[in-house]
Structure formats: C-alpha cells, structure tokens
Amino acid sequence: MSENVQKSENKTNGQPEPESRPSRRGLFASVGAGAVAAALVNPGKIFAASTPPIPSIRIPKEITDTLAEATHVGDFSEKGGITGAEVFAKSCKDEDLAALFCCPGNYQIINAISAAGIPAFGGRSEGSMTSAADGFSRCTGEVTACSGTEGPGFTNMIMNIAVAHRARTPLLVLASNVTIATDDREYFIQTGYQQPTTEGLKKYGKRLIAPDRVHEYAAYAFRNLKTGVPGPVHLDFPGEIYRARFTEASQLKEYYGKEKYRTESRPHPAPKDLAQAVDMINRAERPVIVAGHGVFFRKAWEPLMVAAEKNDIAVVTSGPMRGHFPDEHRLSASLSPDAFMSADLVVFVGQYSMPTKQEWRFNPEAKAIRVNPTAEDLGRNWPLDLGIVSDEAAFLEGLASDLPQKKRDAWVGELASARQKYEKRLLDEYEQGVKHSQATNTLHQAVICKEVHDFLYKGSIDPKQTVTGWGGWTIGNCGARWLRAYRPGQEVNCPYQYSAVGPDLAMMIGAGAAVQLGVGPQAPYKGAPVLVLTSDAGITYSMFELDTAAKYKIPIVCVVFNNNAWGMWPSAVGTPRSMHMYLFQENLRYDKMAEGLGARGEYVRTQDEFRRALKTSYEVAAKERVSTLINVQALKEFTSGKDYPPGNIINPEPSVGALAH
C-alpha cells in the first residue's frame, strides 16, 4: 500500500477515498494559491456551481384556486345543521358586510364569512389588517370587519381599533376567546377579558355567552354599525358559540330579518329648525358649510352640491376622507384658509369630531349651526346658535329645496383670492425645496409632493381616478397640502384625529381592495392603482402587507420619505444623550425589502429619478397589478426651518391639510 493511500485511509476510517474525490492537497494545487485566497474570503464562491438556484417568489396555486371556489352559506337543512359561526356569517351576508380583513385565528368565524362569499383578505399582522378594514370603509362608507385570534392577535389590534374609533369608522371587530368553560383559569392564551380592553374605543361590545343568541347579537352589532353616529363594534366568540349546531331556526332566539331588528328611518329636521337655518344662511354674507364624515357616510354629496350652488355657500370638507365636495369647485374653501376669518356663519354638517373655537381658524364671533343625527353631542366644544337633530342627507335635501337662489360675488371672489395666495405659498415652498434638493443630492418633501400632484392631476391620468392617502409627519403635512380630491372617497386622511404612526400603507391596501372590487363611489374607477405617501418611521409598521397586496393583486404605489429619523428629532436638540433615540441607520434600503416581499423597489435621490420612477411604477401597477415601493432619500434636517426653510409646516384647520378634526 502506498504512503498516500495509507494516509487517506487514516482520514476515512480505513476506507480509501474514491478516485473521483480530490484530496484537499490536490484541490488546492489545482485551483492555485490565488483561488484559495479568494475562497477563504468568500468560501461559498468556489462551490457556487453546486448550489441550487434560489427559487423565485410566487403566489401559491391554492390562493387562486380557493378564491375561485363556489360560495356556501350554511343552511339548517344540511346534514348536521348549521354552526353558530355559520349563523353569524349568514347574518353578515344578509347585512351586506363589505369585506373582512384578518389573520388566521378565530378560524370558524373567518372561514364561515369567507365561504359565504363576503370578500375576505388574509394578511401578515392583525393590527395592519384592522387598518386595512378601516381604509376600505373610509373610501366607501361601508361596514367592514377585521378579525384576530384571542390573546396576542386581539391585543395586536388595539392601536388600530383606537384609530378607527377616533375616525368613527363603522368597523366590526371580531375575535375568538377560547371557551366559557375555561374562564378565570388562564387557559393557554386566554389571559384577560377582551371587552374591558376596548372600553372607550368602541360604540358597542359584547362577549357572546349564549349560543342560541348568536343571531340576536349580530343584530345588536349591525344596529349600532348602521344607525346614528358610526363607530367600532367589538364581539368576541368563545368556542361554545361558534361550535354550537342548530338544525332549525326555532332553536335560535330572536331569529328574524334585518327589516325587523333595525330601521332605515332617519331623523329629519323639524320644520321650524329648517326654516330658521334657511333664514340664517340667507341673512349671512359669508356662510360656509363644514361637510364632515356624516355627509360622506350618508352619501349626501349631491344635495350638498345643490344647496351650495343655489345660494353661493362656501364648503370645506372635513374628516378622515375627502372628496364629498370637489377641491376644484369655485365654492370649495378647502384651499382658502385665509378666508375663514371672514365667515359670519358656520354650518357644521356631520362633523362628528368637534373642535374647539381655538383649534379652527374661523372668526370666533361667527354664528354657528350644527347638524348631528343624535342630540347628546350638540353644543359640545362649540357654542351653537342653532342645534338640529337630523340625518345629514335629510338636512341637506331640505336646504337644497328651501334655499332661495342667491349670488354672493364678493364672497366667491374672496375665496378665489385666498386660494391664489395659498397656491402661491405652495409654489414658493416648492422652489425652496428644489434648491435644497440640488444642494444636498437628496429630495425635499415639497419636490416629492409637487411631482406626485402634477403626475396625478396635470398629466394624462384622469384627475378623479387615483385614490390617495397620506401619513407620517414631515411628508404627511406636506403631502396633505398637495393631494387633491375631486370626487367622493378619493383621499384618505390616514392619521386623522388619533395621529397614529404606521397604519398608512395598510390602510391604503384596504382602500386599494375597495377600488379593485369597485365598491360604492369607487365603481367608476374599478381596477385603478392607489398611491400613498408615508415616512420611514411609518413604513415599519405595515411594510409586510406588501406581501398581502401582491397576493391579492392590489396595485399600490408607496412613496417612502426616507429621512433617516423620527420626525420629532428636533425634540432632542440641546438635550444631552438624547438624539440617538430619534435616529435610524442612514440610507436604509426599504426598496430592497419591498423586493423581498414580491413588490418592485425603486431608489431615488433626484427629481428626475423620482419623476421616472413614479411614471414607471404607476404604469406597472395599472397594467400588471404589481405594487412598487419608491424609496426617496431625504435628510432629517429638512424638517427644520432653521436648517432648510420653511421646514415642516403645520397646516391650518380646517383645510386640505387638516388632521386634528
């Protein structure tokens, strides 16, 4: 036996190495010293030929197959009867629940709702899915549902339930809750009662404990969701409820249709109240209507238009959605905040989140009328000369009928002049932003927002087509000034009132789902892409829902203002050992993260690059239903008026940029 073979045997437990396997000495000799050195630096490279290729991202066949399956609504006559979950799903179907957004958990309920044919979307985080449901409702006015499992899934939804509560969204919050039999035992993930957790964040809530009352409590839910001032309703389902079986309707209590458990009747203004309102408006020289949430939810934009045009009344839209009075209209005051101090009469219609006089720019001496569907809130925060309990549509229909024809040329001229001044300020801000961008080789927020504005409203795209949303601090405040709403449900104010960081992308994926389905006011633009402006701080919370957008082919263009910091970084200036808490790593590649989730990614630093990226991203979204994240590199110092004037400008309220009310 040769010396070489003997050494080989020693290394292989007495078995000679096959001739096809080179020795380490032979391998190194054959590849040469340089290759060996390279392998030590990058050991994977030398064996790359034997590494299988990384498979491409793809949508599982089961997704498209199951979405194409026939619907099934449970029936008492079926073998074994119908489950409590199917009873509840049938109630949701009868009530035209618009959509469900969820993560796995509460399995029997979400499965039954989806099987019944209600559009259902499964995502990556319960909190983000709650915001998606909220966004769907904000651009349609319809009731939507979200769902999560008990324990961690439910608690993950809390911030987003709070966001919906402040926006008065008709959101049906569903969650499983282990079993009644295991109450007080800390059984598995049942670590607390849900209803106390949502106290103060809902209009109504109930833990279901009687299986035969499941339909009755569905009625409670939809009665609250579809009458009065809307708000979240929270139901939690122990296992005894959704697993119960019924073979005939008589086994359920209070089992009858929606025409018997709630009414479509709405309060109308008392004749004397309507007459007084007409008289006050007719006597005023500069009246303005604040058209809030209720005008949108009650689909009252047509009588609003008739009343405004008939009597030359200025209109400013307010709330978590915009467009129920078009921004381009000569009577729109949404871009004329400098004119508000001239108003001598303010008519609040459907303004559910009332400001104080100090928060809004109206003349504190102006007279005030407020129209609300319930009486208990009238007079809160803003002293009234006339409070009217009425459905918003009924009141506006009354105005449209009873107001006389009247021209207010001076008032309309003042609105136009104020608008010109406002738009001039925007252009001045943009010109400063161009200089800052060119000096830093990054992109200022005003440049980003004007480019989006010009692309969506000044180019070849129908200006009414694209639903937009905005969030973040520096980019959100700027974006709100530049985005426009020319028809109902065209703009979603993501941070409205609660000012939460992070729901923006998820909320707009929900809005995108509504556009893809063509629900309500989105019907004429069914299939169009949506666009959202957000921040590097905000994208953290819902970026993984780009996977959800890809899975359901919801095309969204997401513009991320990457300024390497929380927007509140100036709060650390001058304080020792503080700034590090406000900063991120610089130049993070959110575009690369998006690519890893099945979306496109674009990274831009200049105005020309952004313009090209925006055009390409929108075209891909429209033609291929593929989403894109555009990572726009900026500087944190753009927030500072001292470093880069004008800095971050807080928008006047009410106006296109308002978010507090």
Model region roles, listed by residue range:
Residues 85, 106-107, 111-112, 421-522:
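Active-site diphosphate/adenylate-binding microenvironment
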Residues 236-241, 473-475, 633-635:
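A glycine-rich phosphate-binding loop feature that marks nucleotide/adenosyl-phosphate handling sites
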Residues 1-11:
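N-terminal acidic, proline/glycine-rich, low-complexity intrinsically disordered segments
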